[in-house]
């Protein structure tokens, strides 16, 4: 680098190559680097070969160019090197290739008029004394001198107050050894600490005072407790906070000790059960370094591969969760379906219950109507629709009730409440009644409406002669004793078949069945009458036709309460002076029957609309009054008395019994007109 006449101050220096260093011993003034005739640049200093031509110039030490004020960390650096770096130099410069040369003790910054010799070396005693304060400052034991602090320009004074710098090698020797605290902590942490129980057990076994209670075995591989009770009393309280031998054994097992079974244990030679011996492969006499391998065993769940430290497969859990969700949805769907089916079943049950109640009401009304039409014998008349037991019970209750009434009222018997089984053609259709059938049906079942019984107010003298022949056990009143002649006749009839006990006045089998079927077929208009007629007509005509023809054609008679003979045949018998109340009762009964028929037709139309839905077409077109009110003049009909041609009876017969089938409206209108008249 060539000479440069211009001198720049320290503040104006921007390029480190422009720094000029003196070589003739001149120092620095207060304003900066003093002017010099032959200054050298930084490059010349770094290349000492360029200065070999000048013989008058001393060779300074390269370490003197380092300003301690610019490199305060260089003294305490942990890893010093031969690199020079200042705040002015952006990058450090390696100085390994620089060859050291002798220089003056004052260094390149010494002043020319200084008393210090320029040939002083680093090995002089003065230099060594001068370096002591610097070493103290480097170690942090001293403070900078007051003289060095008095100069505000930051430069050292001349002479002995100047503190020269040390070489890099000496600085390495004087530097304090650096300790890596983080690395040392890591090494300390790797050292395994022994458990407190293991340390206590080691000191316990090796203590000579405890040799009587616990000691090493002969081989030194195990520890022996010769007397358990004394060990618990003498040793355990000194080392532990308890005196429980079971707890001590549990801790031994927890840290890997195992009980050693003695050869004599369990035999008859061993009388001492208090001796215990434990063994651990890392607990041996004289081998304390093995204690670091003794650790507390993990729990059984961890040893067996439990879920505490084991890795759980998340996919298995997700699959199981999806399966659970699917099953839950299926169960929810099944629950909804079951709930819906339950609701539907409840609705169907309620509907069926309502239908059952309505049908039961209709059946009850039908039974009441039939009972009102046929009277107390309705159970026998419509017996095909009932069970035989119920029919027997109803019939027996009728007879029993009327017999009790007749027995209580022997002085005045009501002829309307009398029931004659002999005169009733359907009395023995279902067989005779048994005593066990009595008293099983309440009275209200057959006493819904009283039956109309027509009576004869005059006594026939011709009928009294055959009274004893017509009377039987079924048609006499309870409480009256029959005459001796009648008792003999009854005994003779008991030996005969049951069908021979009928004494109904007909002239032939077919004629009898005409009268049997007429009250049923004409009243109900159903196949019930014809069924009985076809079923029993031929039977009676074949078996008992000849016998019944021998009987008289007159109707059956019966004694009254005052000796009066009453006729019980289903025919109207007129007298010389007919009673107007009789016709009024007959008219009332006919009106009631028509009202009942109309009510049943309305029920059937409401439940099952059919041909009678418009109200004009009758549902029972064959439902007429009994044919025995009509005088057809057939051979099967009994002869009517001479007074049957009375004008009132003829009018009743022509207007009521043989009128053509009319609509119910016309009948109702006719009823209203008759009632008004």
Swiss-Prot record:
What is its subcellular localisation? Answer: Nucleus
Q: Summarize what the UniProt record says about post-translational modification.
A: Exhibits temperature-dependent phosphorylation.
Q: Where is the composition biased (Low complexity)?
A: 400-416, 457-501
Q: Which UniProt keywords apply?
A: Activator, DNA-binding, Nucleus, Phosphoprotein, Stress response, Transcription, Transcription regulation
> What are the start and end residues of every segment in region (Involved in trimerization)?
320-373
Outline the segment boundaries, as ranges, of region: Disordered.
1-56, 115-164, 400-444, 457-541, 606-677
Matches recorded under InterPro entries: HSF_DNA-bd (IPR000232), WH-like_DNA-bd_sf (IPR036388), WH_DNA-bd_sf (IPR036390)
Ranges of Basic and acidic residues compositional bias?
650-669
Question: Which residue ranges are recorded for the region named Activatory?
Answer: 466-677
What ranges does the record list as Polar residues composition bias?
115-131, 143-164, 502-541, 629-641
Chief location of this protein within or outside the cell? nucleus
Give GO terms: molecular function aspect only.
DNA binding; DNA-binding transcription factor activity; sequence-specific DNA binding
Looking at the UniProt feature table, which residue ranges are given for the DNA-binding region? 193-297
Any one GO cellular component localisation term in the record: protein-DNA complex
Q: Record's superkingdom?
A: Eukaryota
PANTHER family assigned: HEAT SHOCK FACTOR PROTEIN, HEAT SHOCK TRANSCRIPTION FACTOR
Q: What is the protein's known function? A: DNA-binding transcription factor that specifically binds heat shock promoter elements (HSE) and activates transcription.
What family does the Swiss-Prot or TrEMBL record give for this protein? Belongs to the HSF family.
Subunit structure as annotated in this protein's UniProt entry: Homotrimer. Homotrimerization increases the affinity of HSF1 to DNA.
Q: Provide the protein name.
A: Heat shock transcription factor
What is the originating organism of this protein? Kluyveromyces lactis (strain ATCC 8585 / CBS 2359 / DSM 70799 / NBRC 1267 / NRRL Y-1140 / WM37)
